[in-house]
Amino acid sequence: MRDKKFRYFVTSKRRKIRYSQVNSKKKLMVIFFHGFMSDMEGKKPKSFEKFSKKIQTGFLRFEYSGHGKSSNKLTEGNISKWTDDAYQLINSKINKKKVIFIGSSMGSWIALKLIPKFRKQMAGFIGIGSAPDFTDELMWKKFPRNIKDIINKKGIYNVKNEYGDPYPITKQLIKDGKKNKILKKFMNCFNLPVFLFHGNKDKS
């Protein structure tokens, strides 16, 4: 399962994670975490990869299971599984290099959960339209009763998406998201440089 530009990493749970890695002699690697229902071939990861090549740092982009061309179905995934996908891949690739995490939307949630695991190697964090806890704060708490009933009874509901296909929100995704909430918990970023960017016209 391989193509010319990308490779696949197999996790301990046998999930096949597609990734692209640019190596560098510098002891720094930039790692991009994409958002929900996104992939690693969008404008943001490609732009950051181009910039990383220009300044000659390493760069890693990848797709969680159920996203892009990685294995499994999107509806089988959740924050715990996607965090584990990211952790196993990153842990196998960075060696002793310092890392800068860049998270887009849901990617920031997953990146923030991994900062403590890589704290000795963290050099910075950049969040773009960050959406930690979105399954609870932006979805479940704002869903009307009829939608909550559908999710509880059928296990899934397709939420309208102004950017493309509907978001398939599953009961297990909501339940798992509650276990992974971080916004109301103390988080030690270990004195990291942190930059957060959010568009004023972002309706989401």
Language-model-detected regions and their locations in the chain:
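Short beta-strand element of the alpha/beta-hydrolase
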Residues: 27-35
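Catalytic nucleophile-loop/oxyanion-hole region of alpha/beta-hydrolase
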Residues: 67-94
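Hydrolase active-site cap/lid region
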Residues: 120-169
